Amino acid sequence: MPLTLERIAQAIADHEPAHYELHANTKQAAVAVILKQCDDHTEALFILRASHEGDPWSGHMAFPGGHRDPGDKQLRQTAERETLEEIGLDLGRDGRFLGEIDAVHANPRGRNLDLVVTPFVYLLENVEAKFTPNDEVADVLWGSLNDMYSGDSITVGEFKIRGERHRYSGYAVGGQVVWGLTYRMLDHFFGMLDPDWEPHDAF
């Protein structure tokens, strides 16, 4: 069954998102999963993070987003603020909010980090919107959700972590590999759309 926007919107509306228990030291972050319809398939927007010393997600493919600021009354506000800052896209003007999906606990390799990331899903209604990436973003790319869901874009990525090379399953998008935290978010997303869906493994 194809991943149409109608199917995605209905699944999100019917879904009760899972949350993690927050402790005193738990940090919160939010990302925007931005979708657009392209003829016979649905695409999602990804950013390639610029390389910065000390950033555990430096150089990774990700959804736009970041840490919750004290001034953010809601986590959804965090996702929208960070998207505007990172790629210049005003989701309140150019997008339509579809809903919240399951939160994911971040565990970057080799780091002890209590961080919970909540994804919020949007439809990009203004397909002519221009992106103006800031210095945290090296590129903005669109990837086919249908190819990820079906496993057609599954691949193996090789990454250097603390001086050692590791290989992980991921999705190929625009010459890059979506892996790690964002890969896990997508697996949660596909599992929400289809309870019988099983994660793909490139090995």
PLM regions with names:
Residues 130-147:
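Acidic, glycine-rich loop-and-strand cores that form catalytic or ligand-binding grooves
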